[in-house]
Amino acid sequence: MSLNDAKTTDIYRTMIRIRTFENAVRRLTKEGRIPARFGLYTGQEAVAAGVSAHLRKGDKIGSTHRALGHLIAKGCDLDKLMAELMGKETGFNHGKAGPYHTFDPSVGALGANGIVGGSVPMTAGYALANQLEGERNVAVSYFGEGGSNQGGVQETLNLAACWQLPIVFVCENSSPEVQRMLGHEIDYPQLSIDNVSKRAKNYGMPGSTHTGWDAAEVYKAAGKAIRRARAGKGPTLLEFKVHQLEGNLEGRLEANEKERQWDPIDLLKQKIPRKVDEQIRAEEVAKVQKAIDFGVKSPEPTPEQAYTCVFKEAD
Amino acid sequence: MPAREITFGQALNEAHIAEMERDPKVIVFGENVSSQWREATKGLKERFGRERVRDAPITETAFIGAGVGAAIAGYRPVVELMLVDFGLVAMDQILNQFAKTTYMSGGAISVPMTLRVLTGAGTSSGATHSESLHGLFAHMPGLKVVVPSNPYDAKGLLIASIRDPNPKIFMEHRLLYPVKGQVPKEPYEVPLGVANLVREGKDVTVIATSLMVQEAMNAADELKGKISVEVIDPRTLVPLDEEAIVGSVKKTGRLVVVDEDYLHYGFSGEVVALAAEKALKSLEAPPIRVATPNIPLPFNAKLERELLPSKEKIVAAIKQAAS
């Protein structure tokens, strides 16, 4: 299934929303209004947007500690998301989660995760629940090439194949040329192979590697895997090569043509009429500004709230 | 409720059947759970089908994590871990994800999974097949820790655990499996957080859990007529029935804690601290802990017995506390 114009515009809008939101997060972190620095998704927007274009509300995702793109693409409310990043009472998780543990069950966004690869076994559980429900909902498990080596991820690939779970594993490989860890060069490689997707065969599932900054390619590959999962034919491992782009692209990228070619927004923009682009940007800027205002105006949790929610009361 | 005599293992099996019949969201998985040699889950696959009762590969991280995920997504998984020592390979899923998600999500998420775990020494199985480790799990915030000591409690506590909306680790000493006791046929709950006064006494309080409850009772029997021993089984370490423990210590003024888990930084120390904080003025003698020293459990049966709490050690401790 290739992209039609309407889908292209939807995906582009999602990518702009993520980029705009994260640029605001960068600024707010610098200003001290978001209390901690954390990993952002700039350069990877096509993956979350292209995958989520196939997802519906009953589908569930498990994410990473670089989660904002996944959460926004799955439909998380921007106000509550921004408030959570500011640690406010009105956030999704009342300021207890922050960027690493955000949960929004109302849209099936079942968790950013602070442990590399930590959400992957749980996401198999979401897929298991979907399989038992019989509604043909699927789960998408996001992780990076670093996370792909974790024992839990390898174990879950095997489990998902043994149980034929309706799950798509999405590995965002952010070291497409030289292997890096946490953005730094490494002396020994962390992957013994060039493509993570090669491991799929060993676990008895299809796997393929794609250009992650090309939204059309992401959309196509994800569509095939998600349709397969929905049809009850089991898991797929998709790998998308991406470049994590640092800094506010609006300013910096103009000086760096090499990086610019990896910018998924720049690439897709060519298919968007200029007026539509301007309108989308203006609308998304307004939404993000509303989220910032909401977050800034929201109260902090009270000290008493530190003690709540360790356990739930019986139903 | 009319009761009849069945084993601890059969009581667990009945609890599974009762809850799976009552609630279609209860699912079971783990290593070999479809096999007839796993007593607690015996016959479940035949009765409830292979969708709800599944064998998992020997990958504790994956299947415990999948249980956590299924629980988050609205199911009530009962996941079996063959031995607690094997859970150590899955500590991220147990201690980070299972235990903390409710809090981290600000209550947006419930994780109503029951992780059933076999525990315990006394079978000459060596240092990675013999531990108790309830203190380790009780230390971490977010887990309810259940330690049944007899067939009646096993059934009632497991039913209560499955119905509870929180993460539970349900720890079954494997030497308890053949132990018989009176158990009602009907489903019933033994509430989490309520201790059992196993034996009333006035001279010395003995707090014991799991298999050690029986050892404590054997010791109390031996001292019958000489020292009046009160034996309390907390039944759950989290939540802990502090009132029952403190009340008893205030009554007797003397405390012995018996724990098969390691001595240091554990349950036995927790109970002594509780007595010091809330019943210090009632204490007439220093509290005594009978627990396994912090030494990996050896294979040789004599060496293993040397380290574990025993009736003889408990008798000596009670005598010392009473003197």
Listing of model-derived features with the role each one plays in the protein:
Chain A
Residues 168-171, 208-211, 218, 237-241:
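Short, conserved beta-strand edge motifs with alternating hydrophobic and charged residues
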Residues 13-29:
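N-terminal glycine-rich anion-binding loops that anchor highly charged ligand groups
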Residues 153-156, 220-227:
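Glycine-rich, charged/polar anion/phosphate-binding loops
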Residues 163-183:
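A short, conserved beta-to-alpha structural element at the edge of catalytic cores
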Residues 69, 174-178, 198, 244-246:
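Short gly/pro/ser/thr-enriched loop/turn and capping motifs at secondary-structure boundaries
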Residues 23-26, 33-163, 184-197, 202-204:
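Cofactor-binding active-site loop characterized by glycine-rich and histidine/acidic residues
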